[in-house]
Amino acid sequence: FSLAETKFQVIYVGDDKKDLNDSSIVLKLTYGNTTYLLTGDATNKVEKQILDKNLKSDVLKVGHHGSQYSTHAQFLKAVSPKYAVIQVGKDNSYGHPKDVTVKKLESIGAKIYRTDKDGTIILSSDGENISFETVKTDTNG
């Protein structure tokens, strides 16, 4: 579906009643020539199921808070993001994001933004370029 100049494509609709993380909707957003892949809490299981889709995106909202159960190598290769955004609470009890996930993102040259270190992350785009602004508060670094 479309909203003004923005196109939304539902890549995956989860129905796994046993694992709520894999019940996440995966959504690809296209605005002009910029693309964004929003993965919710999807894990490797979902990532493998959607590899046959056009996943190439400028920005990846990293799945499952950067846990070791998401962002596998084949998926990252298919997405090839320039930027990665990890939504994660500071000093969370799960230890997210995991170092292995951060290293995978670094290895492909993605610029990483993290809410635990960068605070609020604001993306802006004119359809050609993407810019980021971060706003730190007392609760996130």
Predicted regions and their residues:
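Core dinuclear metal-dependent hydrolase active-site scaffold
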Residues: 1-59, 117-141
